[in-house]
Structure formats: structure tokens, C-alpha cells
UniProtKB/Swiss-Prot annotation:
Protein name in UniProt: GMP reductase
SUBUNIT field: Homotetramer.
Listed InterPro entries: Aldolase_TIM, GMP_reductase, GMPR, IMP_DH/GMP_Rdtase_CS, IMP_DH_GMPRt
Organism the protein comes from: Vibrio atlanticus (strain LGP32)
NCBIfam families per UniProt: GMP_reduct_1 (TIGR01305), PRK05096.1 (NF003470)
Keyword line: Metal-binding, NADP, Oxidoreductase, Potassium
Enzyme class, spelled out: oxidoreductase
Amino acid sequence: MRIEQELKLGFKDVLFRPKRSTLKSRSQVELTRDFTFKHSGRQWSGTPVIAANMDSVASFEMAAALAEHGVMTAVHKHYTVEQWAEFAKTADKKTLNNVFVSTGTSEAEFEKVKKIMALSEEFVFICIDIANGYSEHLVEFVQKVRAEFPTKVISAGNVVTGDMVEELILAGADIVKVGIGPGSVCTTRVKTGVGYPQLSAIIECGDAAHGLGGMIIGDGGCSCAGDVSKAFGGGADFVMLGGMLAGHSESGGEVVEQDGKQYMKFYGMSSQSAMDKHSGGVAKYRAAEGKTVLLPYRGSVHNTISDILGGVRSTCTYVGAAKLKELTKRTTFIRVQEQENNVFGKE
């Protein structure tokens, strides 16, 4: 047993230090990034925010809506091949180019991904997603998927330390998904005692990935636009959002009415709700590691994503970053014990 003494930080522990800027308006900030991926050699241009691969967030409808903003969607893995075929026929090229096809690591899921990717040349991104990315099985699965799809962009996770980021990139992942336990409906840290404060995880994993020419997705922990900016400032190439994009008409969640008001069900993918729906209940050998909440119905996602991106633009003007690419170079975080004034409630 050993104890690491170095303090690790989450988004609530820091604020950006403002810096002198020549920017006159938020409209001057360029949020589009241009990426070339290490293994596939593919190029992509867009706003590097991703809707999380949860079935109460990342629907086909969400993918179409977010693509209008140049934003990506990791479509959840519970659609059938037939549903994907219909989506491939009806969606436009921009939407298809901005979706990840999500998968677990079983043999059946591998066969399913092969069928989905064969539906359209426009499917470029694969998201290999398991809760515990420290499994040797994940590394082997990444190698297998890379051998099958040498020209596709592969994301794999989730992990929170540089050593595992490096191993996954060397195994064939272009992007590594970073985050264990920070999500709004995740209870892994409570049920298991395992986790890592998200900002420190992003800083350390980003450093490891960039040293090998790979990239990272900061997955989870964002509760406001400022947190999204902090993730980018800490070195995340992409930021993945679940709860911030849940509860919308495009989210795909179940609508519930209580006291004359509409709510949408939102749950973690290791929650009792998810396992009841997709696995016939919680297996005897495991515990649910997520919760189910009812969110007030929020209407269309367009206003929400515009508000998030507007917040990131504003961050850039405060620190003098004309492009999102420059944000991490212009970032100085200060450690704090307060964030916002809550006299009149939370924003």
C-alpha cells in the first residue's frame, strides 16, 4: 500500500486568471479545430464538443441537431443495425461525419460494429467504451479494431492516468477517453472508492497523449460552460457532455409528467435503470454504479449548445485566446475556495 501526497484538482478547485487581450468581441474567437489523427491519418474540422454515449442523451436526433453546430455525438450502442441503416440513408453527410459508433468489447459487439461501419463510408469514428479502461482486454480489443479498421478514427476509454493513456495509444487508439466517476449520474466513486479529480486527470493524461501524438476526450464532470472551458484549458482536445445535454427534445429520454409538469428521465449507463432496460436487471455479482434522475424538460438543445459555446468564447476573450487551440497556452489556473455567489440561488 502507498499514499500519493500530491493534491489533485477538480473543476470546482480553480478559476482562470484573466489576461490582457486584444480581442474586442466574442465573435472574433474561432472555436473550430482542425485535427489530423495519429493512426488513421484522417483529418477532421469542427467544434470539439461531444454528446456522451448515453441512451438518454446521444440519440440520432441529437446527432442531427448538434451537427448543425459542428459538434459531435457519440451515438449510444443500443440502436440496432437496422436502425443504423435507416439513419445512414436519411442523415446528411455532415451528420454522418460527426458521429461516433459506440461499442463495448464483446465479440457480439465487434461483429455489430463491423456491420454498422459497412453501411456507409461516411462513418469515420468508433468509440470503444467500458467503465474500467484498465482491463487488459480493452487493449487487446483496441488492437483488434485497429487491425479491422486501419483508416477509421478510434477512441478508447475510460482511464485517468498517463501510463494507460500511452498504452491505449500505442495499441492503436487515436483518442483516449479520460474520466472515472465525475459524471452527474455516476456513483462509481461512492460504490467503489475509485476515481481521480477530473481536471488533474485531464492535465496529466493530455500531457501523456500529446507526447505520443495522440489526443484525449475529457469525459464527465462539467456542470456549466465554465467547466467546459476549464477542461479545454487543462489540455483536453475534446470535451464530452452528458448531463448538460440531457433533458432536451433530442435527448431520447423517457418523458414523465408530474404535477402537470414535464420531466425527462436521465440515468447513468451503469445504473439500475440502464441495466433493467438493456441487461435484464443488475447481475448478482455486481452493484449499480449510477443513479436515475428526473430533469425538467428543457425543449430544444440548440439554445443550450449555443449557450455553452458562447461561454467558451467568452473565456477565450478573458484570457486573450483568439482561437480555441490557443486556450491551453493562455491558461493560468488559480486555486480557489469559492466559485460563484449563491445568495440568489445557483445559475
